[in-house]
Amino acid sequence: MRGFPQRKASLVPLKPNGKGNEHIAWLTDLIKELKPNDKVLLICSTKERVESINESLRIEINVKMGMFHEDMTLIQRDRSAAYFAEDDGAQLLLCSEIGSEGRNFQFAHRLVLLDLPLDPALLEQRIGRLDRIGQTETIQIFVPFLLKSGEEMIARWYHEGLDAFETCQQSGHRYVREFGGELTKLMKKADASGANPKKKYDTLLEKTRAFH
């Protein structure tokens, strides 16, 4: 729709490195490529993961960043949001799921989804923190995932099945009701075996694309 920002999704497959820090290593490289005024909003599901990412990044790289999660007071969250909004403030804001509720960050143009909810409405809510009137640039959405894992299953399902990263989904709950159980089983199977159930997964993608 004219007047609304465009979205561009970048799915980033990560090969297991044996250290268990694949997402942090990729995120560190992304930060190194930022220009001084670039802003990145990162959203993940829990405050524990936010705190873990914060600790890991402080070891790996010197970058101005803030946190935003439910155990912070309202004043603390306001200060973090304000610091992120300043031109010379934080380049990276690490948010738990609460960061996708009620706050708008349309001055940022990069969104990192370090994990994905099995809920298209919640995914849209996350993206909506940047996809607002007043957004002046194409929104770059980064979705890193471990190869041959449940992360890959859900990331590709959203992208190849629903096109949910680049287009607004108004009835995503119907897809979850129809395919959520099957997707969850395939995700668990991939995590347990370290291999993708390709035939069954390709069939799921085809059914998802054909579903109305």
Question: Where is each model-derived feature located?
Answer:
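C-terminal accessory region of SF2 helicases/translocases
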Residues: E137-H212
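Conserved helicase motor "Helicase C" RecA-like lobe of SF1/SF2 P-loop NTPases
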Residues: C44-H69
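Conserved interdomain hinge at the start of the Helicase C-terminal
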Residues: L14-S45
